[in-house]
Amino acid sequence: MRDIGSIIESARERQGLSRAELAAALNVSAQTVAKWENDTALPNAENLVALIKMLNIDFSGPAGKEPPSYNSMGSIREIFKIGRGPSSSHTIGPERACLRFRSLYPDADSYRVVLYGSLAKTGKGHGSDTVIKKTLSPAETLVEFDPITPTPHPNTMDMQAFRGGELLGSVRVLSIGGGNVLFGDEVCSSPVVYPHSSFSEISRYCAEKDIALWQYVRENEDSELWDYLLDVWRHMKSAVQRGLRDEGILPGGLSVHKKAKQLFEATHIDESAETRENRLICAYAFAVSEQNASGETIVTSPTCGSAGVLPAVLYYEQQKHGYTDEQILRAIATAGIIGNIIKTNASISGAECGCQAEIGSACAMAAAALGALFELNTDKIEYAAEIALEHHLGLTCDPVCGLVQIPCIERNAVAAMRAINSVSLASLLWNTRKISFDNIVETMKETGHDLLPIYRETAEGGMAKNYNPIKK
């Protein structure tokens, strides 16, 4: 077992934090952090929990015992959230945080919200300040952007409530992706629903009981889930259909034209079946992604920025093969398990792990859903999801001008096609595979933490750096 000190030190350095910065975030002295890293002292239980959460580290605790596991899965409702775009972590997350904070201080007549990290750097482009002010209205709200002060989590916001100029209360909130938020010292954002948290555990259980993944969902979730998933599917279809009708230019200043309708109607007399399939799937993905970029209602799957992948695949398959809504819901439930495993054991946030955590996760979910529609066995579904995620490893999150447009919209279309290819490959080669889905989730997490911050939704590197037509 590695020493606790070396694990803390390497995790801190991976996040680009000095000892003093980490100490300030934990409200301890830099000397205390130094003692932890030199193994001359151990963090107490409260600090241990904070370190796990802030630095995304995994280590054995004092006396050689494993610390409590926080990798317990909540409901797949947390994967599929119905809301307005363009960003789950920058609009849906702050909106949910504001609603919750307002309920804590209903007598407040004014608020102050400070955004840090990625929230500060791309919040203007995502409209974070607009949604915060709108949600907390009619109270007067001051929103400040602080891209300089370091915080252990890239999507951090401080909220303060006032009445008559006097402070009523404050809280630090983390927007951890997919519209999920953590308040204060919370470690888990939702109640535990599933008894397992890895694909290997779930697969073993399903094999023992001879059930499919969607049946595993039905066994553990409440009976109202299926009504919720039907609502999810209706909103997904609505986003596709609206997007196929819409024309014009997306907001934000990049002058990006909506292309879904053009793709959908661009038929050719000599178009092959394969070309038509690709064109339609891309049109459906563009449709949802353009609705998201316009701030319209979509469903996170698992995020706003990757919301076009799963609906594109499912909508195409239902239109082509006539799958019933019940079959589609089973596929969505299967996709939800995949997204939940990734969210629990790694991240679905571009600010934490780059675009691989968003588009890569969405592609894996879509591949698993398609495998469920085709009634593939659990091993083949696992392999399809693994292929889909593996070949997005290292993908950077570098939105031009901080908008969820370039390269985000095209990536949804490419990932939708890749999901279908992943299923085709998995159905033929599943018994020759070497890498498990759990392996690739762990690898994605490590890869994401190794990415420089400029490639994690800060709009400071990659395409965001080299192409900026509206740069002042």
Task: Locate each region found by the language model.
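DNA major-groove recognition helix of helix-turn-helix/homeodomain DNA-binding modules
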Residues: N44-G61
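C-terminal regulatory domains involved in ligand/effector binding and gene-expression control
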Residues: T135, T141-E271, R279-L280
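Alpha-helical residues within the helix-turn-helix
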Residues: E13, A24, K53
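Short alpha-helical DNA-recognition segment
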Residues: G16-K35
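A short, Lys/Arg-rich alpha-helix, primarily the initiator
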Residues: M1-R14
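Functionally critical mobile loop/hinge segments
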Residues: L370-K472
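Accessory "access/gating" subregions that flank catalytic or transport cores
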Residues: K237-G354, G462-K472
